[in-house]
């Protein structure tokens, strides 16, 4: 398997992400959308919309409404504009969700598997409050406390090994997997009400080694592979990870923990 030889730590491989996330994260997103009764005319921000595959499903729920599909990654924005070109009620915006400047107030802020990339969530929820209409809603799920803990444990050990440690001297953690009580306090501080925050386990098993490897490489290892100098080194890092998983006798699975949020302004 050839790995993308792109050293940009902050840019996603949008086309590959489209393929590998369709079964896992798209299914979670559908179920999250099902938790709300949609009237069809809501004004919505899809915060961290990525390549826009889930935005299509959201657009069908609000055929008379308006969706702002917001993402900070230029590759994802380009892919989203391609994927969503036929949806007249969707506008794709290149912006970080915590700085998005929208022309009208929102009925709903929807987000699936994205908020954990924002480290300052106090400012994030304060900004969300400013974007919403009175009685506007948050409908959100993302990585919570303990998320993919087993995979990260293996990755951290590899980072400290003689083979790879020189490349991670300046590595910085780029995600935040919070506990429910931490987010409840932030929502209260941002003056939200009817707050519901929960943490649920979503262990995800893959059908074969190739599917597992591609998902891990594209999604889980994104904050790490950019620190490695070339494609060969990235391949070695992924292969070492897979070898550790097999040696440990673990199934080809990821122990996802999902933090769910509903709140009203």
Name the predicted role of every residue range.
Residues 45, 51-99:
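Class I SAM-dependent methyltransferase SAM/SAH-binding core
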Residues 108-121:
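A short SAM/SAH-binding and catalytic strip from SAM-dependent methyltransferases
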Residues 118-119, 132-134:
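Helix-to-beta-strand junctions that scaffold the AdoMet/dcAdoMet cofactor pocket
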Residues 196-249:
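C-terminal helical/coil "lid" or tail adjacent to the Rossmann-like core of SAM-dependent
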Residues 1-15:
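N-terminal, positively charged/glycine-rich alpha-helical extensions of SAM-dependent methyltransferases
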Residues 101-109:
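A short acidic, Gly/Pro-enriched loop at the edge of an enzyme's catalytic core
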Residues 23-40:
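Conserved alpha-helix/loop element of class I SAM-dependent methyltransferases that forms part
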Residues 122, 137-207:
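Conserved catalytic/acceptor-binding region of the Class I
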């Amino acid at each position: 398997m050839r790995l993308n030889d792109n050293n940009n730590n902050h840019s996603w491989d949008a086309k590959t992400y489209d393929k590998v996330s369709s079964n896992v994260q798209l299914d979670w997103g559908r179920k999250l959308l099902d938790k709300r009764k949609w009237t069809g005319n809501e004004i919505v921000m899809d915060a961290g919309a990525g390549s826009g595959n889930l935005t299509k499903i959201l657009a069908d729920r609000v055929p008379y409404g308006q969706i702002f599909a917001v993402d900070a990654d230029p590759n994802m924005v380009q892919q989203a504009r391609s994927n969503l070109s036929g949806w007249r009620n969707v506008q794709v915006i290149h912006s970080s969700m915590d700085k998005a400047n929208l022309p009208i107030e929102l009925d709903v802020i929807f987000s699936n598997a994205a908020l954990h990339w924002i480290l300052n969530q106090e400012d994030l929820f304060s900004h969300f409050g400013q974007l919403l209409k009175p009685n506007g809603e948050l409908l959100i799920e993302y990585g919570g406390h303990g998320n993919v803990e087993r995979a990260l444990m293996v990755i951290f050990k590899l980072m400290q090994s003689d083979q790879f440690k020189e490349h991670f001297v300046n590595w910085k953690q780029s995600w935040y997997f919070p506990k429910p009580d931490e987010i409840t306090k932030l929502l209260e501080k941002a003056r939200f009400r009817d707050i519901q925050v929960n943490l649920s386990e979503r262990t995800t098993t893959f059908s074969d080694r190739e599917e597992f490897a591609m998902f891990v490489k594209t999604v889980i290892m994104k904050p790490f592979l950019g620190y490695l100098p070339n494609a060969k080194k990235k391949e070695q890092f992924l292969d070492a990870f897979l070898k550790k998983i097999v040696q440990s006798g673990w199934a080809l699975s990821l122990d996802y923990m999902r933090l769910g949020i509903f709140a009203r302004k």
